[in-house]
């Protein structure tokens, strides 16, 4: 028996959902806030009327499926119109898992888990029987988000969660673990940071750069993660040419400090791994000299995410074949590696020639180490000045 549904949205997602599940659903019509949209044509020969949002009626048209990446805003609008989440409407991700009867793999934690969820979607054998859904543990949840998370907790078959030293994070994880059905399979992932490439004398892992402005809910604003040496230069009024000279002469950090710092990183990583169901430290030790493994202190390159994903797939008895991504799965800038650090760690690539992926408000750019430093200096010096004048929080 086909499911009777209404689509909220007439764009790319709605067309893709229709194309994939047209044999399983009966579409009554579509809804849009845009009064100019009057007809939804998912494919040639198929036309459906588009209506403006209305208050809840008898519900004879079927379950409303929100076919939009901005489903949270639309869900709020539906709630204000009298609709009940998961009774009268749900977003397309949940609808897909319901229609296909795939087992939900709930990934709960930081952006590391989001990257793994994206990788799992690229594993063909896994995708035949499982539906990965990521949920962040660091955002305030509104009414719909709380209900959605509860729905996922009650219906997931596998729960992969991130563990940190945060008391709040521990409390959230324990609350979910105690609510899970005993038959749900669980995997714990320690949220690792790696400062080996980026040693600093003043560091608070995963804290906002004191000389940057953070956009609400996002880490990938320009220079979100700070460089304490450059920040100190800015605070002391040291000019850009003097900064260039110090870096070129490899006078930023001495070799003993770099190696001692790296030794501390290995101890911390190995300690964290003891509490994790994943093994990654050995891979980092074997490969960190050969190629860049981390974009900045808290965000990894795709190759690390592939290693984590392969372990999830092995745990579930699936093929570890993953289609490689064309772009970084974690949206944050690559921080430069000081030449003195590259020399002390005996890195096998030339950091002078490395093209760094820099996020800007105009989009992504590839820049040299000198261009990165110049932009960091100019941007963060201005923000440092504005904060000093109490013109920014």
Ranges and model annotations:
Residues 35-98, 162-180:
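Phosphate-bearing ligand-interacting subdomains
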Residues 16-17, 73-77, 115-116:
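Phosphate- and divalent-cation-binding pockets in alpha/beta enzyme and binding domains
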Residues 2-21, 107-109:
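Glycine-rich adenosine-cofactor-binding loop
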Residues 88-393:
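Extracellular glycan-modifying ectodomains
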Residues 21-25, 78, 82, 120-124:
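Active-site catalytic pocket residues across diverse enzymes, especially alpha/beta-hydrolases
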Residues 1-4, 60, 99-104:
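A short, charged/proline- and glycine-enriched loop
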